[in-house]
């Protein structure tokens, strides 16, 4: 799968709270910023689940809708909804061409969902995707490791995205953070 430009999504669970942050930049091709304030992180299922996407915007909206339908079908069971979405995404000839990745989380767990059928739960309660994902991941791991009670999940998520935005040209400082307690 090619690298996705135009976004960074970061999710963290820390001290009993969960937060996900995403920047607002949408890049057309490799040279033009089309939008600065896109909302790529959203609460779903009556505010009990947060989902964030990296990749093609139209593809991601399709996946958001499909994932939300799976959440409803499986009564909010995050793992089951994610696995069923990944199975359908991977096996359907049309859906297989969608170019996006999702991070989904509730108060208890978080998962990376991809079109190649992967559903991955991290060992350390941190996930990041998109063009600035590795920068945000490194910053987030350092912050979480040394934060103790001085930083909450929301602060770690915001600071990780800010760091990625300072390094990655496809990530801006128009950050949206959603939090679960």
Curated annotation (Swiss-Prot):
Q: Which GO terms describe its cellular component?
A: HslUV protease complex; proteasome core complex
Under Gene3D superfamilies, the record lists: Glutamine Phosphoribosylpyrophosphate, subunit 1, domain 1
Say which family it is in.
Belongs to the peptidase T1B family. HslV subfamily.
Q: Which InterPro entries match?
A: ATP-dep_Prtase_HsIV_su, Ntn_hydrolases_N, Proteasome_sua/b, Proteasome_suB-type
Could you describe the subunit structure of this protein? Answer: A double ring-shaped homohexamer of ClpQ is capped on each side by a ring-shaped ClpY homohexamer. The assembly of the ClpQ/ClpY complex is dependent on binding of ATP.
Q: Which UniProt keywords apply?
A: Cytoplasm, Hydrolase, Metal-binding, Protease, Serine protease, Sodium
State the EC number(s). Answer: 3.4.21.-
| Name the UniProt record assigns to this protein | ATP-dependent protease subunit ClpQ
Q: What does this protein do?
A: Protease subunit of a proteasome-like degradation complex.
Q: Provide any one GO MF term from the record.
A: serine-type peptidase activity
Fetch the CDD domains from UniProt: protease_HslV
Q: Which gene encodes it?
A: clpQ
UniProt-annotated location(s): Cytoplasm
Q: Name one GO biological process term.
A: proteolysis involved in protein catabolic process
Residues that bind Na(+): 165, 168, 171
Q: Where is the active site?
A: 2
